[in-house]
Design a protein with these regions (language model features):
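An N-terminally biased module of ancient metal coordination in phosphate/nucleic-acid-related enzymes
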Residues: 1-98, 157-169, 193, 229-235, ...
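Short, basic/aromatic-enriched C-terminal tail that caps enzymatic domains
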Residues: 244, 249-266
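Short acidic/histidine-rich active-site segments
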Residues: 44, 151, 218-234, 254-257
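Structural preference for beta-strand elements that scaffold enzyme active sites
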Residues: 5-9, 38-40, 73-77, 100-103, ...
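Conserved, mostly hydrophobic/aromatic
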Residues: 11, 31, 102, 150, ...
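Extended hydrophobic/aromatic segments used for targeting, binding, or gating
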Residues: 199-223, 235-242
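Anion (oxyanion) recognition and catalysis
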Residues: 32, 183, 214-215, 245
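Extended substrate/RNA-proximal surfaces in nucleic-acid metabolism proteins
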Residues: 52-184
Length: 266
């Protein structure tokens, strides 16, 4: 990894997320060690079971850590999960703090557990993935966020972990509409590198979808490792940057006070 060419990591979790035990200070220390100038703390706010205390603490810690150092900008982020499943709670979460960056995600579809807990066969997987993209399209049309996280999230578990192949062809019209809606609304698409921590893992989404986003008018790409521990911070970033470059992007984007700021590639 050529550490000097990693501009940012805008998908990080701390012990303010239910699935991480890493203090925010350790994530910042690791980013500084790697020479990364921008990071965003994006702790989980899965809207059906979020903690306002954790989100407020994450936000405050980002501000405190940002004030400590001149060599890194620590952004106040949030990973807003399943926002359409309780709109009142979503409004409350978005109004709780001032954020630099709202990263939107969908870990579970209505009436189902997180894909992490599901082990569908091929027929069940086809139905679940269809419902996932239907709800994701609704979410993208809602539009109250900055970047869309891990577009192909179900494949992290259905295909990568459980080895169930999924024919994506039937979903391509919905995926095209999702990406064109992001592009038309000036939203970013995340290249999530977490899959590359696994043997034979892949980017979420893969490079062909990044290229499709660009062809449909997409302007902004964010990069995120989805690291829950310091050793995973920035893993796979070179591959993510390569995918963005190959698609025709000239830089990646960070959001400061909810406004896009492009960082040109080195």
């Amino acid at each position: 990894m050529n550490l000097l060419k990693i501009p940012c990591d805008c998908h990080l979790h701390t012990d303010n997320s239910f699935d991480s035990e890493t203090p925010a200070a350790l994530q910042v220390a690791r980013a500084r060690e790697l020479g990364i100038p921008y990071i965003a703390l994006t702790d989980h706010c899965d809207i059906l079971e979020w903690s306002d205390a954790n989100i407020a603490r994450s936000n405050a810690q980002a501000m405190e850590l940002n004030a400590l150092y001149d060599d890194i900008t620590v952004l106040r982020g949030i990973e807003l999960g399943e926002p359409l499943q309780d709109m009142d709670e979503t409004s409350r979460a978005l109004g709780l703090c001032e954020y630099d960056f709202v990263l939107c995600s969908l870990h579970n579809i209505r009436g189902e557990e997180d894909f992490y807990y599901l082990h569908p066969d091929r027929a069940q997987a086809a139905d679940l993935v269809r419902r996932y993209f239907e709800e994701l399209l609704e979410t993208v049309k809602w539009n109250q966020f900055d970047s869309l996280a891990h577009l192909t999230y179900p494949l992290r578990y259905i295909t990568e972990r459980d080895g169930v192949s999924v024919d994506m062809t039937p979903y391509l019209p919905m995926i095209q509409e999702i990406l064109s809606t992001l592009a038309a609304n000036g939203k970013a698409l995340e290249i999530n590198t977490s899959g590359l921590r696994n043997p034979d893992g892949m980017l979420l989404p893969t490079a062909d979808y990044v290229e499709l986003f660009r062809r449909l008018g997409g302007r902004y790409i964010t990069l995120g490792s989805d690291a829950h521990t310091p050793e995973h911070l920035a893993v796979g970033m070179e591959e993510g940057i390569a995918a963005a470059k190959e698609a025709g992007f000239t830089g990646v984007t960070v959001f400061i006070n909810r406004q896009p700021v492009e960082i040109p590639f080195a």
